[in-house]
Amino acid sequence: MRSPRSDSGSLVSSSATSDNAATQIVLAFDDNRLASLLFGQYGQNLALIERRLGVVAEQRGNHVTLAGSRDGVERSRRVLEGLYEQLRRGDELVSGDVEGAIRLAIAQGSLFDYDPATARPSFEEINLRKRAVRARTAAQDAYIRALRRHALVFGTGPAGTGKTWLAVAHAVQLFERKEVDRIILSRPAVEAGERLGFLPGDMREKVDPYLRPIYDALYDLMDPRIVERALQTGEIEIAPLAFMRGRTLSNAVIILDEAQNTTTMQMKMFLTRLGENSRMIVTGDPSQVDLPPGQTSGLAEATRLLRNVEGIGHIVYTAEDVVRHELVARIVDAYDKAALKPARGRDIKE
């Protein structure tokens, strides 16, 4: 039996009974409104915890009873306490935060022994003026650490794993800290055949449709007025891949998105633009190459050639790291399995 009060004051009481592997505890939260947000509409957050951690969670008012294996109950308790503290700080709670907290609790139990006195309290976090961005998976955690450690980082994997999002967040953090002068955004415009001169409008209008995911991240992570001003002054620069030849990019964070659609020569040209006090982040999904048949992906070749080069980070995401709606991970996994079946007897280029 235990009835502590947490340091935050969020956990009012809890009780526990244990019979071998079976455990039951009761948690009570002192703010009814926050408890309601914690449990989710119609208890959807509790339902997700039940599904992912193999426990039974029964809610009564601001109390929740957790029953199941000792490990499952302990992980569920850490998830609920962590999310409640997030709400007490005034932060918004979305379904992705719940999934991230669950993955953290699982990682604490499987990647290293959990000891409340010594365990890492959470995955890595990027603190920005507008908001904090926290890794939700072990791969994202490793990605953030790689971004801080290396001048060049490759992040590859399926859509929805946060590769581009975290790259932009890291770039914004360095920009806000004045560690770099500029953020440079680029991607190959395969759909336009890189012949951007034939498209109407100025350079930003030509490239905007191809960089929309990066723009969305910028506006979500920074004050829109600051983004617009930085675009006007060139502190945030849109640089089509085809227009980067001959430049040396210094004191900047350069992000190349959708890099799976670069050719070998384009990738080599891009990587050799790295200048003094600059960081490069290359993201892409090797399974979504839109190059003409027979054309080797510059991303696939670069990650192969540079895998053991000192000073370069490589993070590979899988379907398990998808942080969009939980169905997205299943969809990606289904497509990946289907793609493997007809591969036999066929010449598949990397």
Model region roles, listed by residue range:
Residues 34-51:
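Short amphipathic alpha-helix segments
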Residues 17-36:
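Short glycine-/aliphatic-rich beta-strand segments at the starts of folded cytosolic domains
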Residues 1-19, 341-350:
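Acidic, low-complexity intrinsically disordered tails
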Residues 118-132:
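Conserved adenine-nucleotide phosphate-binding loops and their immediately adjacent elements
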Residues 58-120:
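Interdomain "pre-motor" coupling segment immediately N-terminal to P-loop NTPase/helicase cores
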Residues 63, 128-138, 146-256, 260-350:
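Conserved helicase motor core of SF1/SF2 NTP-dependent helicases
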